[in-house]
Amino acid sequence: MEYDPLLSRTLNRDPHLGSFAHILSRRNSNIRETERRLTAGQTGLENFSAGHEFFGLHYRKGGWVFREWAPNADRIYLIGNFCGWKEDERYALRRIDASEGVWEIRLPEKTLQHQDLYRLRVHWPGGSGDRIPAYARRVVQDRHTQIFNAQLWRPENPYEWKHPVPSAESLESLHIYEAHVGMAQEEPKIGTYLEFTKKVLPRIIRAGYDTVQLMAIQEHPYYGSFGYQVSNFFAACSRFGTPDELKALVDAAHEAGLRVIMDLIHSHAVSNEVEGLSRFDGTTYQFFHEGPRGHHATWNSRCFNYGKYQVLHFLLSNCRFWLDEYRFDGFRFDGVTSMLYIDHGLGKAFTSYHDYFNDNVDEDALVYLALANKVIHSVRPDAVTIAEDMSGMPGLAAPVNEGGYGFDYRFAMGVPDLWIRMIKEIPDEHWPIGHLWYELNNRRPEEKTISYAESHDQALVGDQTLIFRLIGADMYDHMHAEDDLLRVNRGIALHKMIRLITLATAGHGYLNFMGNEFGHPEWIDFPREGNGWSHDYARRQWGLADNPDLKYHFLADFDRKMIGISDQFRLLAVPEVHLLREHAEDKVLAFERAGLLFVFNFHPFQSHPDYRFRAPEGEYRVILDTDSPIFGGHGRLQPDECHFTFSPPPDPHDPVLSLYLPSRSAFVMERVTGRAFRQERRM
């Protein structure tokens, strides 16, 4: 059977896909056919994804118009402080499209004012309930009653954007700083957009990262959900501040040349009915699958039916909304694995290609993800999309027309698991260097990946950050700069080495969760009944990194230098990594990338004098040393020391380097010239 030439290119790159070519072809056809059906062959996806400009509350031609989709409803009232929160026929919506279930009301301008609260009272056969509009752009919670309502946001002086988005030329690689606005503050409280802009954004800029990934932006009723139980998909989280304050945050980041991407939660929705979409019109199936498939048992949330026209309209419009309204520069799609598989991939190892091409795959979800990427890149060609998938689904970060699903990047989610296993289960002297190298570089070459040693996942309560796994409770008593405890020294050394080799072998991007760059202690535990609603573990102790008398600043300084070198030498823009030396017993790895030489000695106590390995001919200068005293090391190498390759007999054309490799350390060398030391040396 012949396939589309572009699909054939994918099959040629990965022969294992050949047995499933007919499924790939069918999925690709489904994407094209769904796009044709949604756009009716006339308007493009960019127009189709403008549902947020039709539904919801809008000021149009001197008055207000509100529309909602509720096909099972038989009566809907707009209620709020403008009508004493009572049903009033003056505020009754009328059904304007019986077949589609679209409702509308038009009101004079004077009816509604800035910051008015409102909601819907929806009646359906056999029942009724209050609901927050599905397209509400601002939702607030009353501090006393804890009740959520939609709020009209129409200030007299709306926010005016001051700075352009970063240029497309800066997109060749990503250094991502993952952050949560609410827990970004030092004080034990919920932080705000304004505080983040003033206090945290400058730290990110100084640290050298070029992209901020903001978590928990979509409105969510329960703060402790980390933002993953979304109720109002078009509303920015109000507990952090106003829409204008979020825009100012994004604008300030753009002024500094930073991209801002956000976590986009389209994998599920909160099960709350009043605040969320569940049983919005009295049915369980309006937005979600009916029956057990519509409920995520592990997350206690609702699962979207990606095969429904109006669900696609809602979610695709949501993608466009955040680009248009808040000028976000892209998205990290959360929970993609849960979307892809009917069983959500729970408890599966994904050891065979058959796992990606059987009846357990939700092909409607694949179609949605492909169309979402098409919408995003149509609205903003330079936008960044990242897939969080732990299953390894082939093609997620491949072009749609080549049988992929259009993401720009995918997370290398096996890397943090690798580090946890090695630290937790294997003594240092038995670390499998060959396996380490394989896993760090195990990725589909045609798909861009983002690596990380740890993210927010590893910092949550019940888990441990890398630094805490390495040092443990000694962090509380032995992090003074002059303290010389062996366990602490080991932890600091490995923390730097782990992060350096993860970045140096990353595909096209690197991610760090806020605070991990300086070894922030302890896990994250949001306020909850079990901890007395305390914020003590839902904050960042920046003062630890600012204190010169503590060791934390060594890690922060090292990370800043490491990120700076990666940016200066465009490390992640050069995907090729060339292995020069791998030795299991010596615990040595040496490799070249972007003209830089990376040398690692993971041996816990054995230093290697006069250690030789082949390298590109030239003169090399050390530009980063994990063992430098300025980074809390022992200073066993000479700063800025230069080394020349030489060609020992019998082959004068086979240059080698001879280096001193201190134990449990790593360094980076820049090739400053192609000039070698020509005099032959004795072996």
Residue map of PLM features:
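Catalytic cores of secreted or luminal carbohydrate-active enzymes
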Residues: 541, 548-569
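C-terminal beta-strand-rich structural cap/linker in extracellular carbohydrate-active enzymes
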Residues: 114-118, 640-683
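The feature marks proteins involved in alpha-glucan
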Residues: 1-61, 65, 86-88, 92-178, ...
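C-terminal accessory region downstream of the catalytic core in glycan-modifying enzymes
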Residues: 562, 613-644
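Conserved, mostly hydrophobic/aromatic
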Residues: 68, 120, 179, 204, ...
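Surface-exposed beta-strand/loop patches in extracellular or lumenal glycoproteins
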Residues: 66-70, 76-80, 603-619
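Substrate-binding/active-site clefts of carbohydrate-active enzymes
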Residues: 140, 158, 162-174, 180-361, ...
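Conserved alpha/beta catalytic core and glycan-binding cleft of carbohydrate-active enzymes
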Residues: 144-148, 327-329, 347-538, 567-612, ...
